[in-house]
Amino acid sequence: LFKQKNGRILQALYNGEDAWTGDRSRDDLYFCWNVNFRNGNDLAQTDRIFRASGRMRDKWDEVHWSDGTTYGQRTLARSYNKR
């Protein structure tokens, strides 16, 4: 993951830095999108990687939508790569 062209950015994001857009939510999405792109859209694995990263925070498991969806669930769904 970190040996790609954008590997330095992804490493910084994994470490919890806001290294791409400066917006935590956008950086979360960008990070998840890149992980999904490389793992064949294994959302469970992406969730585990995110939780192990410095990006993890309480917001990930908080409900943010009226349908009961958490921030993490919505971010993972939005990061799914259509091929």
Residue ranges with predicted function:
Residues 1-83:
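Modules that initiate DNA replication and primer synthesis
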